[in-house]
Structure formats: C-alpha cells, structure tokens
Regions:
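Active-site-adjacent "subsite" loops/lids of carbohydrate-active enzymes
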Residues: 60-89, 157-158, 163-221, 225
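C-terminal motif of bacterial Sec signal peptides marking the signal peptidase cleavage site
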Residues: 18-20
Length: 418
C-alpha cells in the first residue's frame, strides 16, 4: 500500500491516538453470552462447515456477509503499545470501540510486518515495537487484541506481510529464527533472503519451497493458537522488477523461460499455500488478499496473478483491491476500476471487498475538494450487488485527525453506515 511504505514514524503517534478517540458510546460490549450479531456467518449456517476437523475447538469464527473493515497498521499499533499490559489493553479497546461506533464490523490488524511477530511464535522473532525482555514478550498483544475486538462484535483478520523483512540492523536481532539462518548464510542459502538495489530492506524469496512453507506454517500457527477470524495479506509481493533480485534462483529453475510468469507462479504458489494452511486448521476461517487497485500494476510490478486467484478455487475467500482513486482519476477512475474488478471475480467462492483510501482526503485535490467522497464511495459499494463490502485505509486517517474537515468526513461516513 502506498502509505504503508512509511517507516520510522510510528512512535510519534501515541499522543494523537489517545487524544483523538470518538466520544464513548453507551453501547454495551458483546460478551460470551451475547447473541450473535446480524448477518454473521457461523458454522450452523453451513452444514458442510460443521463437519470439519477444527483444531481450535473452543472458538467459533466471527465473519460477516458484508465486510465493513478498517485496516490497523503496525504504525497505528506502535502508538498504542505500552510497557504496561493494562495500558495497551485500554488503548486497543478504545480503538476497537471507535471502529465499532463508526459502524464497521471487521478489522485487519498487522501482526507481522517485517518478518516479525506481534504474538508468541515459534517461527518469528518478536516485533521491535513490542515490549520484550531478552526476546520474551512481557504480554501477548495478539491475545489481547482478539479478546477486545470480539467484545465489540468485530471480526479480527490477522494481517501479514509474508515476504517483507527488515533492515540489516534488525535482521541481526533475529537470531534463532529460520529467517536469520537464511540471511546469515547466503552461500548455503543463495537468494532465500534478498535485498533489492537501492533499498535498505531484505525480502524473502517466494521461489523456494522452504520459504513458502515457513510462510504457510506461520499462518497455520496463527489460526491454531489464536481466536482469529481470518488471515489477510496486502500488495507487498515482489519488491522490485530488477532481474538481479533472484537471477540465481530463476536460472536454477530450468523449466522456466519467462521471468515474469515464473515470478507470478511463485506468488500464486505462496497464496495457495497460505490458503491451504489456514483451511487445514479451520475451513470456516477466511483468507483474503489486498492487491493494488491498478490492475496492470499487479502484473507489471508486483507479479500478482489476481485474475487467476479470483477465477479458480483454492486461492482466496475474498479479494480487497486498493481502489484508492477518485471518480475523476485520469488513469483509474473509481467507478470504472471497481467494475473491472467485478469482471474478474468469477469464482463463486470469492467475494469482492472494495478498499477505499481515507488518507487521500489530505493528499489529492478531488478528495480535498469533494466533501463526503469516501461516504459516497461506500454508498456505491453498498448499492452494488457484486460487492460484499469495503475496507477503509486506515485507522490513523479515520481517528487521529482532529481538524474540522476530518471530523466532518468521519461524520458523513458514520451517517452512511448507520
């Protein structure tokens, strides 16, 4: 995502997050004994689902026919995390209350952004943003987040960046993990972890089955150990179009003769493996991908074969393209772009969720000049029978802006939802 490429500013958001929350509502939290909210997909609604082997038998996933989602990024979380478990619980609970009060029912929350973990993991090192001592977490943020989200009736999708790792400084702190072994022994594991030219960040290479297995195992670990409702990845597939990034791996793949197709096949294998890993734990859990809204970019820059994933079984439950464009955009006008995505979602088991860019309200003229444009776009998705919801990027843009313009925009969004 465009805005998610920001780094290093996360710790500055704490004060903004704590002071910008909406007025506390009198709406009661949902408890274990509360009735299931309307339009919820549960096991009882699908006799096939009730016959599945479920490894996390104590939890029934909470998902909605129509997703009304908000992305909560690692940048947002860094401003909420605290040395105190109780303080973090209060901060994240307030965030979920804000999302619920707005009229939304789902959150995509970052739990792995840089080859790290916001939870207890046997595969990944703790995130640099999490309070820890000698690599041991002081508390488990993900356990707290799922508990608090469900109190407000929010479906919780664990958001991963499966391939992106970190800078050299933080890669050196991942000792004891598989990623560190690959990173520290490039002679033994050539290009398992690669760094594009003119970039400080390392990336996992999906060309290798061992890499794809690690990513899939990490998704299964989340599904089995935590009360999540889905797994979600975004548009960070290949970080570069440079041939040098993975030339050794490509050369070794003797059956491949087209670099672009080979890379797309690698990503498709990875997406399929994550899907299968999640479903192996509980077929009621959802798996979704949020690719770039510009269809061509997925093929020419990211090597993401979105048409394949939306037309064949075994890849997705939903796709949430980032249609962060205005109605008058010269390259990807909103209505036309949404229609293009509708046309490729032909697999009956894949739903379309429209990603909307709230952050554009302070970045582009059409969004700045057209008051209520996000609310209007939400209305368009709700009126479109081919859409199964929307997702708003991001929490920061929705709730940490205190100027009159953003307050009015949020008011119009809430009015549209309610």
């Amino acid at each position: 995502m465009e805005l998610k490429k920001m780094n290093g500013i996360a710790v500055l958001l704490t004060a903004a997050l704590l002071c910008s929350c909406s007025t506390k509502s009198d709406k009661p939290k949902i408890t274990q004994n509360s009735p299931v909210p309307q339009n919820v997909l549960t096991a009882s609604q699908d006799s096939k689902q009730t016959q599945q082997t479920v490894k996390n038998e104590e939890y029934t996933p909470l998902n909605y026919d129509e997703q009304k989602a908000v992305w909560i990024s690692y940048i947002d979380l860094a401003g909420m995390l605290d040395d105190s478990e109780s303080a973090f619980r209060e901060n994240i609970s307030k965030a979920f209350e804000n999302v619920s009060d707005l009229g939304c029912n789902t959150v995509y929350v970052h739990v792995r952004a840089f080859g790290d973990a916001y939870y207890v993991s046997q595969y990944f090192a703790p995130s640099k943003y999490i309070p820890a001592e000698d690599g041991t977490l002081r508390y488990d943020p993900l356990k707290i987040m799922t508990d608090e989200a469900h109190k407000y009736g929010l479906s919780f999708h664990a958001w991963l960046n499966p391939l992106r790792c970190d800078t050299q400084v933080y890669m050196e702190k991942m000792q004891g993990t598989q990623i560190y072994e690959w990173y520290s022994q490039p002679g033994k594991y050539p290009e398992y972890v690669s760094k594009p030219d003119n970039s400080d960040y390392y990336w996992l290479n999906p060309a290798y089955p061992e890499v794809r297995k690690l990513i899939a195992d990490g998704a299964a670990e989340l599904a089995e150990n935590y009360d999540i409702d889905g797994v979600h990845i975004d548009d960070y597939f290949y970080p570069t179009t440079e041939k040098s990034f993975d030339m050794q791996a490509f050369t070794a793949a003797q059956t491949a003769d087209d670099l672009s197709q080979w890379r797309m096949d690698n990503c498709s294998e990875m997406v399929h493996d994550i899907y299968e890993a999640v479903k192996s734990v509980d077929k009621r859990l959802l798996f979704g991908v949020s690719p770039q809204g510009n269809m061509d970019n997925n093929y020419t820059q990211m090597y993401a074969d979105v048409k394949k994933w939306c037309s064949e079984e075994g890849y997705l439950d939903y796709i949430a393209p980032q249609i962060y464009f205005g109605y008058e955009n010269s390259v990807c006008p909103f209505s036309e772009t949404l229609k293009n995505w509708e046309n490729i979602v032909i697999c009956k088991n894949v739903k379309l969720v429209c990603g909307l860019g709230v952050y554009k309200l302070e970045r582009e003229d059409e969004f700045i000049n057209d008051m209520g444009i996000i609310a209007r776009q939400i209305g368009d998705t709700e009126a479109d029978e081919n859409c199964s919801g929307f997702a708003l990027y991001s929490y920061q843009s929705l709730f940490t802006k205190t100027d009159e313009r953003f307050l009015e925009e949020r008011k119009e969004i809430s009015a549209q939802l309610k």
